[in-house]
Amino acid sequence: IQSLVSSAVYGTPQRSATGFDTKRMNMLLAVLEKKCGFRLGSKDVFLNITGGIKIEDTAIDLAIICSILSSDRDIAIDTQTCFSGEIGLSGEIRAVNRINERISEAEKLGYKQIFISKYNKFSDKGLAIKIITCSKIEEVFKYLFLKN
């Protein structure tokens, strides 16, 4: 997932998504603005799902949010980190289905840590991947971007 966030130069900010529903991206941006206090209203936001695929699974919401915030803050996220969580309208991170399979697959792909909803029930027996549970976007933001 790639995002580019920059100051809007042509008046009305542009919002564009390739491989992801633009309406859902706009909803996620509205949640970041209204419920989480991130100021993106005057910025262009471009989102790209690499590889030419189209993703409709809401479990990608958390990864989309983190990609956008990473670009906005100009702080890279460790490439060995992945995310699986649906974002609700109040900024909460909702549980997703098949979380054990998602965690296992992330580990097989070489990821060292995964952020998931604290409301997911999962088993970490025999896994080396670090599982970080959060209930709100702000918790993930603090963990990724405000640690010293």
Language model regions located:
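Peripheral, non-AAA+ core regions of ATP-driven protein-machinery
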Residues: S3-N148
